[in-house]
Regions:
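Membrane-proximal intracellular helices of multi-pass ion channels
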Residues: 1-321
Length: 321
């Protein structure tokens, strides 16, 4: 019930703001009211479906402050997860928040602000994207929007086909990380990646425990994070390889990779090449979306029968790396 309450309240508040904006500022009349609530729900649920048509998304409104801020806020709120929202409601002070909430909020802040700076740096001199915008505010807002929308939202205010290859690859990394657990988004999840990074950093410095915010992460949780990362990576690489075969060299390899990761993280961003693939290619994308949405471990294990190992074998060390 709390999940439904949070979702309806957030969607109603931002939907009302957007409905009034579409109705008055964009002069769309009564149609704008429906459009406002549609886009609010679509953004909060990280769906990315828009009503502008022609695969334009929000590219015609990159300088609309109200629309951009509302959509970014909805994507972010929907992407941090209902568990964190409930924790924030109960505990207003940082010290009282659960470890999970601290990790999610920290990772989200790093991805948003760091992603904004990287995209701004990569696209600042590109005349087809940020370089062609009239003022600094528009450039910063567009860079921030692309960083946020990679959290599995699917909206865009820049034509992705005009972006540089380095920017698309960086967006692939952001999409692969995705949103947070119990959220409306997909991907490997922010907690998985942050735990992996901290664990790896600790191992490089000779530390056996993974510690975050003065709390030790259970070894079982760290192992699960490694398993999730490995299976997700293998799935995306496998889908990428198969789609390269289906594509037959028709499109750029980085475009194919972009579509695969976007599908796995259920982002919805695209560079317009999906309609060109045959039924096998589209089936691979569909399966990839299912695996990414319900969790690749859950998806794979649903086809396997787990058996308890009743035999415990002797251990032996091997050389790694």
């Amino acid at each position: 019930l709390n999940v439904v309450k949070y979702a309806l309240t957030i969607e109603f508040i931002f939907g009302t703001i957007l409905a009034w904006h579409f109705y008055s500022a964009l002069d769309m009349g009564l149609t704008g009211i429906a459009w406002g609530y549609w886009h609010a729900i679509s953004a909060f649920c990280n769906a990315g479906f828009d009503l502008f048509g022609d695969y334009a998304s929000l590219t015609g409104h990159y300088n609309d402050i109200t629309l951009n801020l509302c959509i970014m806020a909805l994507i972010t709120i929907g992407g941090i997860g209902f568990t964190v929202l409930d924790d924030l409601r109960r505990n207003r002070k940082w010290k009282k928040l659960r470890l999970h909430s601290k990790i999610v909020l920290t990772a989200s802040a790093i991805l948003t602000f760091g992603g904004t700076l990287v995209i701004l740096a990569l696209e600042y001199t590109n005349p087809a994207t940020l370089g062609g915008m009239p003022n600094e505010l528009d450039k910063w807002m567009a860079a921030a929007f692309q960083a946020v929308t990679c959290r599995t939202a699917g909206f865009n205010t820049i034509d992705l086909t005009d972006m540089r290859a380095s920017s698309l690859f960086f967006m692939v990394l952001l999409m692969g990380i995705g949103a947070s657990p119990t959220s409306t988004g997909g991907g490997m999840k922010t907690t998985t990646v942050l735990v992996l990074l901290v664990s790896t950093w600790g191992l490089l410095h000779g530390k056996r425990d993974t510690v975050l915010f003065d709390r030790r992460i259970a070894s079982e949780t760290v192992d699960k994070a490694y398993n999730v990362f490995t299976v997700c990576l293998l799935w995306m690489l496998g889908a990428y390889f198969l789609l390269l075969i289906c594509d037959g060299g028709l499109h750029r390899a980085d475009y194919v990779l972009f579509e695969v990761v976007s599908a796995f993280a259920t982002v919805g961003l695209g560079v317009g090449i999906t309609p060109d693939w045959n039924d096998w290619g589209k089936l691979i994308l569909v399966l990839t979306m299912y695996a990414g949405r319900i969790g690749v471990l859950t998806f794979v294990l649903s086809f396997l029968h787990s058996k308890d190992d009743k035999i415990r074998y002797p251990s032996e060390n091997i050389m790694i790396g």
